[in-house]
Amino acid sequence: MKNDRDTLEFEANANKYSWVWKKATEKSRYRLFEKITSLFQEINLELQYTGIKFSINTEYSPEYLKEAASKYVEIWQLDETTFVAGKGHRKSVQQRHYEKLKEYLSKLNDYVEKIQICGDGRNSYSKTDHSATFMRIKKDYMGNDQLLPAYNVQVGVADEYIAVVDVNQYRSDMDCFIPLMNKFHDIYGFYPKYPVADAGYGSYNNYIFCEQNGLEKYMKFPMFKKETTDRNYHEYPF
């Protein structure tokens, strides 16, 4: 059975300036880890005469910070209702340290949540639509190369009929090929024999998938045209 596929990027109904970038969030989290380490070093210096010491690591979990904040309150018998604020009030060392612990805990929870929403398969999402991923769509009505929140919609056609449709969060068509083939298999109980697709789908992982599941490899790889028709490339490949 011959199965052709193409992709469409549908812009999501989300604010196009509401992006969250996974890599930027991870960098911010590691900078926060450094601040937490510095804070624990200060607290350990403060508590050295008590024999109590908080463990210092390269990474921290929200649970550990929450436990540390509770322990710190217990050690100093802190009462938040007595905390001072505003001009003319000098905060105690204990109040400053405790407030920093709470601040860092809040930030760390925020970073962890953002990274979990992104998941392993994508690097961004929209604050107003967590299912949408920022990608370049084929037709940008703004006439520019701006990244927009969208969904990658895959359509498989067999004998001029739409056989399967799949909606993904992946920016690359390469990553959408295997989920689409598996969805086809779930519906019909077999894989299409001839999965015809353009070079955007050709990758080592997809070829291996075809080999393992009895599909003919009808997708060109991204450099196919250059490697087969470009004379300069053959003479100077590097």
Listing of model-derived features with the role each one plays in the protein:
Residues 1-238:
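Anion-binding and metal-coordination hotspots
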